[in-house]
Amino acid sequence: MAHIHNDDFEMAKSDPQALFAFRGTPRKVLFNPGDRLFRFTSQPQGTFRGNEIFSSPWWHAQSTFNAIVRTANATGNSVADAARSGLAVSPNWNPTMEWLVIIELTKPVYGWVGPARHQPVKDGDRSALFLGNADQAYVPGLATGGNGMSSPFANIYYYGSMMGV
């Protein structure tokens, strides 16, 4: 049987900040070829260098994207605002969230999925929080052997602007 990417990865021994990004303990999930993973990104601007595509381990599944769109429609907020709140993404990490990246897996990979932990709207000020609670996926090492725009485990399926959506 072929080795599955991240099969030997131990989330409990990973970066403590990654574990802290989840509300509770994330569950190990097998993503199969043909599965699509999503993430919102920001382009470089000022001192922000932009979000990398495959180098970042943070993604979410189609079901989370669908829930974000439903929330945006129900509240009248933009998809980016609904995503920022549900995924608890600080503007310091991703200032605009105006671009959507969808990748399609070409090989099976393991990831860890669970609800996003709340995060402060502004660093150091816990008086206002992004609530989180939307399922996020931590899938490390997708860029192994590739670069920021390619991966031996996935192809870019879609990369486009979310401005005005």
What spans do the regions from the language model cover?
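Catalytic toxin/effector domains delivered as secreted proteins or via bacterial secretion systems
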Residues: 16-164
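N-terminal low-complexity, Pro/Thr/Ser-rich intrinsically disordered segments
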Residues: 1-23
